[in-house]
UniProtKB/Swiss-Prot annotation:
Biased composition (Pro residues): 335-344
SMART domains (UniProt xref): HOX, LIM
Gene: LHX3
Residue segments, region Disordered: 197-383
Protein name: LIM/homeobox protein Lhx3
Listed GO CC annotations: nucleus
Organism: Sus scrofa
Matching PANTHER family: LIM/HOMEOBOX PROTEIN LHX, LIM_HOMEOBOX PROTEIN LHX3
């Protein structure tokens, strides 16, 4: 072969792209526009001779299996290519090998009919493990961080609270350095302490009013037994501080004088069912403290500070004693605290006549020809 010319019959002998030697075989393979020996045309990955079919990418040649493994659809779990002849599992847009289609927690391979959850990173979690993880997460979120304060630290904080219930920042920094507690812990302790003081004052006021109304009930000779019992709320421990981003209810409630409380609707001017257009008559009794929720500290209408103060208040003085409107059967009586312009309460006339009315409210009396003749009878000196 050394003396054999490079041209045979006027044609140039091709060179093999694999070994760079002249191809003198009977059969010549051609791929990627180049000539190959049959033994030189191999897969770039497994080096298997490519006799029947080959796949190319760039300057490399591959067999069918290696080509799809490298450039075909990849498994979402192992990121390896999946041959087109292999059975796969699908979850939405993700494709998995059969052995890769398993729960990442318990490693159990998921079969047809099993319930699972698909995470954002294409991982699979079986239903049992997912619900268990969710429950643990909820329990961990519900537990707020708590700090236990020693007796010495508690004594220092109480002493500072007695001096100033709302200390400045530099005072809190000093307390933090003295007690060794975090600034946030000191701040939360003072917030909880102030809320507790407000709650205790509010509960004490409720007990005083409740006792007063029970005494009034007994004084009137009520036959029903009083089953109301005052439950003392358990006192929070000052040695435990819990963190929360929400303001305390004591600071948001009506105790700060900004907002009125929401309670049962007052029946003073309500319309009872079955009697449309009429208003109930009130016979005596003292207004409870909840009816003064709309008053401001600067209001001329004073709110009694204690039940004992109500006993010393003088009774209402009637402003209009004989002015009646027979055509509507309505009378006007004063109903309000003394010391200011009393509001007027409208009383229904569809029933017994009022004690303050001089005429009959059950019928229509004969009116004089001129309204001035009966309007002059009203004593205007009272105004």
């Amino acid at each position: 072969w050394e003396g054999r010319p490079q041209e045979l019959g006027g044609k140039e002998i091709p060179l093999c792209a694999g070994c760079d030697q002249h191809i003198l075989d009977r059969f010549i393979l051609k791929a990627l526009d180049r000539h190959w020996h049959s033994k030189c045309l191999k897969c770039s990955d497994c080096h298997t001779p490519l006799a029947e079919r080959c796949f190319s990418r760039g300057e490399s040649l591959y067999c069918k299996d290696d080509f799809f493994k490298r450039f075909g659809t990849k498994c979402a779990a192992c990121q390896l290519g999946i041959p087109p002849t292999q059975v796969v599992r699908r979850a939405q847009d993700f494709v998995y090998h059969l052995h890769c289609f398993a729960c990442v927690v318990c490693k159990r391979q998921l079969a047809t009919g099993d319930e699972f959850y698909l995470m954002e990173d294409s991982r699979l979690v079986c239903k049992a493990d997912y619900e268990t993880a969710k429950q643990r997460e909820a329990e961990a979120t519900a537990k707020r961080p708590r700090t236990t304060i020693t007796a010495k630290q508690l004594e220092t904080l109480k002493s500072a609270y007695n001096t100033s219930p709302k200390p400045a920042r530099h005072v809190r920094e000093q307390l933090s350095s003295e007690t060794g507690l975090d600034m946030r812990v000191v701040q939360v302790w003072f917030q909880n302490r102030r809320a507790k003081e407000k709650r205790l004052k509010k509960d004490a006021g409720r007990q005083r009013w409740g006792q007063y109304f029970r005494n009034m009930k007994r004084a009137r000779g009520g036959s029903k037994s009083d089953k109301d019992s005052v439950q003392e709320e358990g006192q929070d421990s000052d040695a435990e501080v819990s963190f929360t981003d929400e303001p305390s209810m004591a600071e948001m409630g009506p105790a700060n004088g900004l907002y009125g409380g929401l309670g049962e609707p007052a029946p003073a001017l309500g319309r009872p069912s079955g009697a449309p257009g009429s208003f109930p008559l009130e016979h005596g009794g003292l207004a409870g403290p909840e009816q003064y929720g709309e008053l401001r500290p600067s209001s001329p209408y004073g709110v009694p500070s204690s039940p004992a103060a109500l006993q010393s208040l003088p009774g209402p003085q009637p402003l209009l004693s004989s002015l009646v409107y027979p055509e509507a059967g309505l009378g006007l009586v004063p109903a309000g605290p003394p010391g200011g312009p009393p509001p007027m309460r409208v009383l229904a006339g569809n029933g017994p006549s009022s004690d303050l009315s001089t005429g009959s409210s059950g019928g229509y009396p004969d009116f004089p020809a001129s309204p001035a003749s009966w309007l002059d009878e009203v004593d205007h000196a009272q105004f």
